[in-house]
Amino acid sequence: FIGRHVVSHLLGAGARVKVVDLVAHPDPSVDLVQGDIADREILEEALSGGVDAIVHLAAVTSVLKSMEHPELTYRTNVEGTNTLLAAGRAAGAGALVFASTNAVTGPMEAPAITESATLRPLTPYGATKAAGEMLMSAYTASFGLRCAVMRLTNVYGPGMQAKDSIVARLMRAIRLGGTFEIYGDGRQVRDYVHAADVTAAVRLGLTDESWAGPAVIGSGRSLSVLEVLDAVSQVTGTELKVTHGPGRPGEMPAVIVDPSRALALGWDPRYSFEDGLAGVWQEWSALDLDAVAAGVGTVGAPR
């Protein structure tokens, strides 16, 4: 999802892009190496001929999946990251942008999460991303590899048909006429950042040497699940049937972030949640129902 936005942006900027992915996405403009990021031979093939910089987005990103499959999460998120760092160093990479998460910090200890927050993850997903951050720190200190760590909040935008995050789940429920289940009371709050704004941060992380270490990438505006539901109803003109289920283990009750460091480094996010949501709905409303049900298909945007 995020990778398609980043690849599209980099190609538009004239960069030569090579992609490593478990799943084949036929695209004549991209040199694709299909395989597991934890496989050193795959990475050596992908990085043969040298590389200027690496964007590391490959991960198990679902909190629920990480709790169901912690070993797989560790293999992909930790072993894969370690293998990529070693292969990237050997290939002469000058910089690496790493997609991390604010889930590395666990419960909030201050009015807003900043880069100085204590790392205290609550789930295998958060823990493996924290381990990835430590590997980035070690490679910077030991080998001089500049690593820009992006602590992303909830990313949404066009092309998220296969995702299980709240915006995708809401869109799917509206198009298919289903009931939307809220985990808990719906008052838990999250920050939402548009994929295009994340892509802009990634581009800065690749090109600006002042981007090193962690930076919080979020809108700075948090919304409760109930507020997101209201916003979706306003954009789509549809009132969803809602049920409440139990809260999820390891879920943070609040994510409120302060992106001041990223802003000071030149990041300039453009999308309000409402404007971004309108674009997401425009895409979903044009999809046929079979594609929605299957979690595939896009209209006029990177997947």
Locate predicted features.
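Conserved glycine-rich Rossmann-like NAD(P)H-binding loop of the short-chain dehydrogenase/reductase
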Residues: A15-P26
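A hydrophobic alpha-helix adjacent to the NAD(P)-binding/active-site core of NAD(P)-dependent oxidoreductases
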Residues: L32, A46, T73-Y74, G88
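Conserved NAD(P)H cofactor-binding loop of Rossmann-fold oxidoreductase domains
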Residues: A58-T61, S100-T101
